Amino acid sequence: LVTMHRRENQGQPMRAVFGALREMVDQEPTIEVVYPVHLSPAVQEAANDLLGDHDRIHLIAPLDVLDFHNLASRSYFIMSDSGGVQEEAPSLGKPVLVLRDTTERPEGVKAGTLKLVGTDPTVVKTTMTELLTNESLYLQMANARNPYGDGRASERIVQAIKHYFGQGEAAEEFHEGEKE
């Protein structure tokens, strides 16, 4: 699964990533790519020019959040420049190759759920190859502790309210980076 739309990546950086992606799909017959293409004319043009005629690269319309999460959960890994995807994918156990040189989500890099790749085509291809061929690396990223939560916030809120009213023990705290 690929998403790429940031203005900073439009133009040559985006074209470089798309070229690398196409080369990887050409070299590896088992790779299928789904790319919900952003509505930006610059993104549409680059995607259609470089990826549009490949039978294993599927350019589709942008998805609503439920359909996107459904697709992401069925993906092997995700390549994206989206901050939201960087936060959501770890909840699905999906490694993310971040198509940027920096991120506003350094906790994801620190936890091991994200890897900064940038837009250099050589780095993109090398990192994709590593994730596709190194099962240990894949499992390490896929099973890393989600730094954005463990899915138990509602339980903790209910427990905290009960505790406040003297109806139970204090809620267990979430500690970023600790594996259960």
Feature-to-residue mapping (PLM):
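Nucleotide-activated sugar donor-binding and catalytic core shared by glycosyltransferases
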Residues: L1-Y35, S40-E180
